[in-house]
Amino acid sequence: MNQPERYELIELMGLPKVTYELDSKSPNAAVVTLEKEDHTLANMLANQLLSDERVLFAGYKVPHPLNHNFILRVQTVEDCSPKQVIVDAAKSLITHLEEIKVNFMREWELKMISVEGVEMEFS
């Protein structure tokens, strides 16, 4: 068949997951490349970074739709490193996603209880 093997979409095959480089064109800027990730994580991370007042610029690009990686560019104020801001944004995203998961599971369980209650009345 004329398609890549499915394991190639998630297996790194010797590539580092994250590559971090300081940007020589701008002060206090960095370029981060994440392998085997797509717009989902890139958009969440860029938006989380933009909500931080220490961040002057945050944006990403996906070089090619068939290559599953993205390049994130971050520029911060002088007294803060881009690496620390990215780590803080990732931790904040994890916390936020955990809250969403807890809320979803609670609502799902309430929905299941209400469905079971309806089924019991008609049985």
Curated annotation (Swiss-Prot):
InterPro entries: RBP11, RBP11-like, RBP11-like_dimer, RNA_pol_Rpb11_13-16kDa_CS, Rpo11-like
Keywords: DNA-directed RNA polymerase, Nucleus, Transcription
Record has Transcription as a keyword: yes
Any one biological process term the GO annotation gives: transcription initiation at RNA polymerase II promoter
Domain of life: Eukaryota
Location of this chain's protein in the cell: Nucleus
SUPFAM superfamilies: RBP11-like subunits of RNA polymerase
Main localization, broad class: nucleus
GO molecular function: DNA binding; DNA-directed RNA polymerase activity; protein dimerization activity
GO cellular component: cytosol; nucleus; RNA polymerase II, core complex; RNA polymerase II, holoenzyme
Keyword Transcription set for record: yes
Pfam families xref list: RNA_pol_L_2 (PF13656)
Family to which this protein belongs: Belongs to the archaeal Rpo11/eukaryotic RPB11/RPC19 RNA polymerase subunit family.
The protein's role, per its UniProt record: DNA-dependent RNA polymerase catalyzes the transcription of DNA into RNA using the four ribonucleoside triphosphates as substrates. Component of RNA polymerase II which synthesizes mRNA precursors and many functional non-coding RNAs. Pol II is the central component of the basal RNA polymerase II transcription machinery. It is composed of mobile elements that move relative to each other. RPB11 is part of the core element with the central large cleft.
Subunit structure and binding partners: Component of the RNA polymerase II (Pol II) complex consisting of 12 subunits.
Protein name: DNA-directed RNA polymerase II subunit RPB11
Organism: Schizosaccharomyces pombe (strain 972 / ATCC 24843) (Fission yeast)
Lineage of origin: Eukaryota, Fungi, Dikarya, Ascomycota, Taphrinomycotina
